[in-house]
Swiss-Prot record:
Species name: Halobacterium salinarum (strain ATCC 700922 / JCM 11081 / NRC-1) (Halobacterium halobium)
Keywords: Metal-binding, Ribonucleoprotein, Ribosomal protein, RNA-binding, rRNA-binding, Zinc, Zinc-finger
Protein name: Large ribosomal subunit protein eL42
Cofactor(s) the protein requires to work: Zn(2+)
Pfam families recorded: Ribosomal_L44 (PF00935)
Residue numbers binding Zn(2+): 11, 14, 72, 75
SUPFAM superfamilies membership: Zn-binding ribosomal proteins (SSF57829)
UniProt gene name: rpl44e
InterPro entries attached to this UniProt entry: Ribosomal_eL44, Ribosomal_LSU_eL42, Ribosomal_zn-bd
GO molecular function: large ribosomal subunit rRNA binding; structural constituent of ribosome; zinc ion binding
Zinc fingers classed as C4-type: ranges: 11-75
Length: 93
């Protein structure tokens, strides 16, 4: 799916319509061993099913959701919106 990089839309910070620039959100840094430490503690428990699922989830969705950040040209603040499913997203100039 092709989408324009710059378009006029509503900015919730300015409370007005301005030109917004869309950019793909990069993945953030992982926060150390927090999740893994909890998982290890659950797995080493002596009672129950050791933190395992009864049926392992398998398979991937055919498409991914878009993850875009919209930056206002007037105030410079960025905001997020709910994404949609698209096979491939290309931002046009």
């Amino acid at each position: 799916m092709e989408m324009p990089r710059r378009f006029n839309s509503y900015c919730p910070n300015c409370d007005e319509h301005h030109q917004l620039e869309a950019e793909k959100v990069r993945s953030g840094r992982s926060s150390g061993m927090k999740w893994d430490a909890r998982r290890t503690k659950r797995a080493n428990a002596s009672i129950g099913n050791h933190g395992r699922f009864s049926k392992v989830p398998v398979g991937n969705k055919p498409t991914n959701r878009t993850d875009l950040k919209y930056r206002c040209s007037e105030c410079g603040n960025a905001h997020l919106r709910e994404g949609w499913r698209a096979g491939r997203l290309v931002l046009q100039e």
